Regions:
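Asp-box/WD-like beta-propeller blade repeats and closely related beta-sheet repeat scaffolds
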Residues: 101-108, 125-179
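Residue-level signature of beta-propeller blades and closely related beta-rich strand-turn architectures
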Residues: 58-60, 124-126, 189-191, 262-264, ...
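Entry beta-strands of beta-propeller and related beta-repeat scaffolds
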Residues: 51-55, 117-121, 182-185, 252-258, ...
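Blade-edge beta-strand/turn elements of extracellular beta-propeller
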Residues: 23-33, 86-100, 145-167, 214-235, ...
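Loop/turn-rich, solvent-exposed surfaces of beta-rich toroidal or solenoidal domains
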Residues: 293-392
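Beta-propeller blade signature
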Residues: 68-87, 132-150, 198-220, 270-283, ...
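Beta-propeller and closely related beta-sheet repeat lectin domains
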Residues: 41-45, 102-111, 172-176, 240-245, ...
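Beta-propeller domains
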Residues: 23-34, 43-95, 123, 127-138, ...
Length: 406
């Protein structure tokens, strides 16, 4: 289980009828590959005109207990992929200055795309400048169309990056989302030193326990960070390597849900099971519901069915403390193994939540630290939420699961 998935999963969405007011759908998974694309995980991704941009992450699979997160196994290329033709373009990060290059080959960074800009925060990796493994105190703004043109056409790379240094962004394993021009940097931790079994006291680690908000302004072609703030919750936000997904809540308000994640304070290898709803006005833990089947960052996609006022979030594989057997009985494994489970968490019209596993499974124990790339032309609502009601009847290619640890 220390390799990386080099195939791409084609995720197909089947839309049958509705039953008893609850929208039903099924899934099918197939595989494809892009020649020359390395196995990636824990990377950043963006899209433009049907093509994909990948930056950072790892190519060595699950980190080992010793000599983890070495530079030699970092993704040191910028990749542009055309999923329709299978064409791949790559350019080395070595063409960039040290301080920029080092952050860009980090892992577990936070990222979100705003129009043509990829906002890339933090990340963990080896810094030759600092002579240590660090969480990068940087926010980097990336011109996606310009960079993709440079990668595919041989132009200069550096003009398409702007880096801002600020310890506010020294976070790894968190999540970054955007709502109404405000960025939400949620959860995660800061880790300084070598991540290994014998790190001992030679490390510094602390969880942010926070929702950090900020805005960006462009002045004279340069980006400025404005209006920083933070809300700290040492219980409910003490999580990393989790899933944060855009949501439409029962009353129609948009926001996010922080799902599961690791680790509960004071408990060894105990994931969070309760989600947290995040709105502009604040955050509230979901009471009376546990998410059992996806406890770690994995490929995911949010789907809203307006006719039923139901918000579905689909999760693909990853790591989980629980799994379903052939009889749909819930089994527990405190070692938190990799799983093949495909599951959904649904917010129903009355505001309650339910979780269910699909009959289909992933063909490998993968999905952890993978990314879901929507197929071009899929109808979406705010923040990339799939518009279920606008999808045609029958089977539909919804998107692709790229990378992940096997």
């Amino acid at each position: 289980m220390d390799s990386i998935l080099k195939n791409i999963f084609l995720f197909l969405f089947a839309l049958p009828c509705a039953l008893s007011g609850q929208t039903l759908f099924d899934i099918r998974v197939d595989t494809a590959s892009i020649a020359g694309l390395p196995g990636l995980h824990s990377f950043a991704a963006a899209t433009h005109e049907g093509k994909w941009l990948f930056i950072g992450g790892r190519i060595d699979g699950m980190h080992q207990k010793f000599n983890a997160f070495s530079t030699s196994s970092a993704n040191q290329q910028i990749q542009v992929v055309d999923p329709l033709t299978g064409q791949l373009w790559q350019r080395p990060l070595s063409e960039l200055p040290d301080t920029l290059r080092e952050q860009l080959h980090s892992a577990n960074m936070e990222f979100v795309q705003q129009g043509g800009t990829l906002v890339f925060a933090g990340g963990y990796g080896r810094s030759e400048v600092a002579q240590d493994h660090i969480t990068y105190p940087c926010l980097t703004l990336i011109d996606v169309p310009g960079l993709m043109d440079a990668v595919t056409g041989g132009g200069a790379l550096q003009p398409h990056f702007q880096q801002i240094r600020d310890t506010f962004f020294a976070v790894t394993g968190g999540q970054l989302q955007l709502l109404n021009d405000t960025f939400y940097l949620v959860g995660g931790h800061r880790f300084q030193g070598v991540y290994s079994a014998n790190s001992g006291t030679n490390i510094l680690q602390f969880y942010t326990n926070a929702i950090r908000k900020f805005t960006l302004d462009s002045v004279g072609g340069a980006w400025l960070v404005t209006h920083q703030s933070a809300v700290v919750d040492e219980l409910n936000l003490h999580r990393r390597d989790y899933n944060l997904a855009p949501q439409i809540f029962a009353g129609g308000e948009t926001g996010f849900t922080a799902f599961s994640g690791v680790f509960q304070p004071g408990l060894a290898l105990a994931p969070f099971l309760n989600p947290v709803e995040i709105r502009p006005s604040g955050h509230v833990p979901v009471e009376g519901f546990n998410q059992y089947l996806a406890n770690y960052h994995c490929a995911k996609v949010p789907v809203f069915a307006q006719a039923d006022n139901a918000m579905h979030t689909l999760f693909f594989g990853g790591i989980s403390q629980y799994w379903l057997d052939a009889n749909d009985s819930l089994n527990r494994d405190n070692r938190l193994p990799f799983v093949k489970t495909v599951s959904r968490v649904s917010r129903l019209a009355d505001g309650t939540y339910e979780e269910a596993g699909f009959d289909a499974e992933l063909p490998f124990f993968t999905g952890s630290s993978a990314e879901f790339m929507l197929a071009d032309g899929i109808p979406t609502l705010t923040n990339g939420i799939v518009d279920y009601d606008a999808l045609p009847d029958g089977e539909q290619l919804l998107g692709y699961i790229v990378g992940g640890i096997v």
